[in-house]
Amino acid sequence: MSSKQATSPFACTADGEEAMTQDLTSREKEEGSDQHPASHLPLHPIMHNKPHSEELPTLVSTIQQDADWDSVLSSQQRMESENNKLCSLYSFRNTSTSPHKPDEGSREREIMNSVTFGTPERRKGSLADVVDTLKQKKLEEMTRTEQEDSSCMEKLLSKDWKEKMERLNTSELLGEIKGTPESLAEKERQLSTMITQLISLREQLLAAHDEQKKLAASQIEKQRQQMDLARQQQEQIARQQQQLLQQQHKINLLQQQIQVQGHMPPLMIPIFPHDQRTLAAAAAAQQGFLFPPGITYKPGDNYPVQFIPSTMAAAAASGLSPLQLQKGHVSHPQINPRLKGISDRFGRNLDPSEHGGGHSYNHRQIEQLYAAQLASMQVSPGAKMPSTPQPPNSAGAVSPTGIKNEKRGTSPVTQVKDETTAQPLNLSSRPKTAEPVKSPTSPTQNLFPASKTSPVNLPNKSSIPSPIGGSLGRGSSLDILSSLNSPALFGDQDTVMKAIQEARKMREQIQREQQQQPHGVDGKLSSMNNMGLSNCRTEKERTRFENLGPQLTGKSSEDGKLGPGVIDLTRPEDAEGSKAMNGSAAKLQQYYCWPTGGATVAEARVYRDARGRASSEPHIKRPMNAFMVWAKDERRKILQAFPDMHNSNISKILGSRWKSMSNQEKQPYYEEQARLSKIHLEKYPNYKYKPRPKRTCIVDGKKLRIGEYKQLMRSRRQEMRQFFTVGQQPQMPITTGTGVVYPGAITMATTTPSPQMTSDCSSTSASPEPSLPVIQSTYGMKMDGASLAGNDMINGEDEMEAYDDYEDDPKSDYSSENEAPEPVSAN
């Protein structure tokens, strides 16, 4: 019974507690927002930490000791809520799928039993304990949140405090600045001065920077302009130099062709004033060398004479021959500056009275005319000269360009030109051979007249061949003369080019005429063969002479093909090639073989053997050294003053003068040497100097030096001259500055015996017919008989060449960038 009595109050109490807890839960729902979130925390971890047997008794004892009912109610309410949560938690754990451990189950049962069957004191004590723990947790959470809030506040306040401290510092600074009004004014003044100084400094820096920019830009612009100007000047200079070189080259080439084809030597051609009578006379003389009967010309007319230098005159005149101005049948040849020397050598005065002329001239008159022409040569080109004074003791007035020779009126023949051309550059005044006139219309004419008369006397039908042909109109001659009359000839290139074009037209007409007469060379060749073969001493010489026929006519046994050593000079490139091969400017002309009449120009050939090198390798001239640059002009001056002076004497004078010159005087010539060497190196980068071997001549089986050979040839020529010209005044052939003789016919002096045809020492023409010269080289050739170079040493050019080759004068192997065809040009 006791057990039942003991359990009944517990049950009643439990029912009362359940009702109380229900009431508390309803209140909690009403006061839901007032409860702290921490009160809803589960209590099972706290209750697990304490022994279950002690929880309820302590809770009951705590409730009994608490006198405040409100606190008890609040604690009970919390306890009930916690118990409800605990029961729900246990129910959740019981309904979970995970199996429960046996101890946990027993433990939970004990807790439930203790909770269900504990006394109220125990329950109150446990509630108080729970409240304490909750308070402790709340405090901990509050402290944690306060710490977090304090850290955030510190972060926020740190900025505020910094600003406050900065304000404080500035206020302190302002407090320091604050002072007496004088100090403030002084400080303000200092600040204003500093500000103005800084502003001025900034402006100065900006201005200096701008100036530097402008200066740099201006300097760059100036440099660019200077570079552009220098480049333009260099280009212009290069173009001008190239044009000058091309023009000089063309003029030289045309001059050579014109001189050769037009039979015109480079004379000092007088330019007559614009007088129709004079022009008509010149045109008539150009075509026939005779005045028509209706035109009169007074030789005593005084007119200013204007001289053209020989190099330009030959290119401009393009084949004009000396004006043979005649009145009726009176000849008017042009005087030669070396007439005195020629007359001395022949022991005769140039006295036309031998032919019945009305005028006689002694040596004094010739000297005066010679001096007058020398003086005229000193005048600059294009300058006007007054008329030359007449000799005081002359019977009649004399033209300043020549001596008037008269012939017998009863003579049925015409007077042949008795002159040598005015060549101030001829380096030697050797006696010229007599050459009669031969008509191109009678190529097979007998060379030896039956009568013992003068070789200048020929039948009436023989006339001097006109260089431009009789069919050339009178208008072209007048045009050329009028173009030559221009005083600005040398300042106007158009005039020169016009004259050159006229010369080309003449050349084309000459070619057409020669093509219409193809039998001319055959006739000349037959006459030459008759003459040469009859004089050949040995069979070897006869065979060699016979072999010259196909070569001279341009015909070959191999279907017109020429050998490797034959060059066609009608093509400009071949002419240039031969110019480069021949070692010196003087030698270029000596290899030209131009037929004077009958044959076509296409038959002009060069026959030459290579000199110590392969035949295909052209000869490259050495660049001129400083001495040669200086001597070129000095030699020209000496020749103008002394045309008869020999080249060896001129070279000795130049050598002594060069040695006496100071280095300062030589400096510009060394600079020119460096420039020429640079040009030569650019043009021939692989050039290597190969000196030419010394030549010796084999005559009659003996080796002779050049001096001995020249003496032997001189004596033999003198013998032949005396044999053929006994009692006769020799006729002078027309010679050019190129060293090639172009007479109108074959002379007696060139019909020498066979050595002339077989001379291996001749470097120029050695043919009886000078219009068809044969070039032979001395290298690799032998000779059986004596040799006589007919025209070899007649011309002064050959003397110079011999001196160049054998007396160590280096001029012959030197070249300049603007070489003239002549060895030494007068202008």
Swiss-Prot record:
The species this protein was found in: Mus musculus (Mouse)
Keywords: Activator, Coiled coil, Cytoplasm, Developmental protein, Differentiation, DNA-binding, Isopeptide bond, Nucleus, Phosphoprotein, Repressor, Transcription, Transcription regulation, Ubl conjugation
Protein name: Transcription factor SOX-6
Gene giving rise to this polypeptide: Sox6
UniProt biased composition (Polar residues): 1-10, 421-431, 439-461
Segments of skewed composition (Acidic residues): 795-808
Coiled-coil residue spans: 184-262
Phenotype upon gene inactivation: Newborn mice display mild skeletal abnormalities. Knockout mice also display increase in prematurely differentiated oligodendrocyte precursor cells in the motor neuron progenitor domain of the spinal tube at 11.5 dpc. At 18.5 dpc the number and distribution of oligodendroglia are normal, however there is an increased number of differentiating oligodendrocytes.
Induction behaviour: Expression is dependent on SOX9.
Modified sites of kind Phosphoserine: S399, S439, S442
Glycyl lysine isopeptide (Lys-Gly) (interchain with G-Cter in SUMO) crosslink residues: K404, K417
Region listing for Disordered, in residue ranges: 1-51, 334-361, 379-470, 752-772, 786-827
PROSITE patterns linked to this entry: HMG_BOX_2
Subcellular localization: Nucleus; Cytoplasm
